[in-house]
Amino acid sequence: FAPLTSRGSQQYRALTVSELTQQMFDAKNMMAACDPRHGRYLTVAAIFRGRMSMKEVDEQMLNVQNKNSSYFVEWIPNNVKTAVCDIPPRGLKMSATFIGNSTAIQELFKRISEQFTAMFRRKAFLHWYTGEGMDEMEFTEAESNMNDLVSEYQQYQDATAEEEGEFDEEEGDEEAA
């Protein structure tokens, strides 16, 4: 969400679409403890609220994509969507909300997995769950699912448009056989 400032200070600053866009993509403003500069965006949605030019919003979003093209996967066309609602949020002249699916989230999943593994190895707190009817195997399965998710995000981060073309050809060969 942008602007990330106190409501009281809002009346003294006039925000621009450019500043909102910059704040949205700023690593310090992310709600998850991962740095998007360590990954690539698969998809992005940005919702702007307030009186502003749709043209300016589109230009700013395109500008971010062009300046930071290495942080966006090229094999998903039109992977950035924007919307503008001309009714501003209460107490603000304009705001923006950002939702991004970035491969950088694997950092967070890896940390959680490491912490889980350390606790599970010691069987810490496990009795509370098994006492309620859960099986130890469910935890092992959840750990495996988490590791699969991390691997999948890593593949998406490393993938290129050329590789996807090769994959399509392989699929066609399998169907022909």
Curated annotation (Swiss-Prot):
Residues 156-177 are annotated as: Disordered. One of its GO terms (biological process) is microtubule-based process. One of its GO terms (molecular function) is GTPase activity. GO terms for cellular component: cytoplasm; microtubule. Residues 160-177 have a biased composition (Acidic residues). SMART domains: Tubulin_C (SM00865). It is found in: Cytoplasm, Cytoskeleton. The keyword Cell membrane does not apply. Its cofactor is Mg(2+). InterPro entries: Beta_tubulin, Tub_FtsZ_C, Tubulin/FtsZ-like_C, Tubulin/FtsZ_2-layer-sand-dom, Tubulin_C. Keywords: Cytoplasm, Cytoskeleton, GTP-binding, Microtubule, Nucleotide-binding. This is Tubulin beta chain. It comes from Lytechinus pictus.
